[in-house]
Amino acid sequence: LAPADRDLAPGDPREIEIESSPHLVVTSLGGNDYNHQGGDTPSNASFTAASAAFTDSLFERYANPELVVIHICGMGSPAEAAFDPDNNRCRPCPHVRDATTAYVAANPTRRVHYLLVPCNGSVVDDVGDIGCNGHKNRLGQAQVADFLEPRIRSIMGW
């Protein structure tokens, strides 16, 4: 949409004031850093530093002592990898895991977790769950949600 057509979200969405503070933020990081980059991917050190800065920004932005941040990774399937071999959704996962582990070690009072959603077909099984350009459709998204829900529930103590 052209800027004049942005009636629902005028201005920079990063500057929208939020009235309340969430108890949970779930992120999916690393996919664009480690796929489709022609081999020009970040080092573990630079990715870990950027991930830490981003995670810090969440705690600064929301200033909720009860805030839980969960960095998820994966969510792929064999069909997605076959459709686009340079879009391996699990490729960034060791980097995201290591960055999260380093963050937790440096910030033990903050509730930050890592969750891997496998890419082996055990979650998104390639049966009617892939839509446009190899992305998950509504069924694929529901499969990921069904996998994550009990794990998030456990982390949150719900």
Where are these regions (language model features)?
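Catalytic His-Asp segment of secreted/periplasmic serine-dependent ester chemistry enzymes
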Residues: 35, 75-158
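Extracytoplasmic, non-cytosolic globular domains
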Residues: 42-74, 78-79, 88-101, 148
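Structural recognition of the beta-strand scaffold that forms the well-ordered cores
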Residues: 23-28, 33, 68-73, 113-117
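Conserved SGNH/GDSL esterase-like catalytic core that processes O-acyl groups on lipids
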Residues: 1-52, 80-94, 121, 131
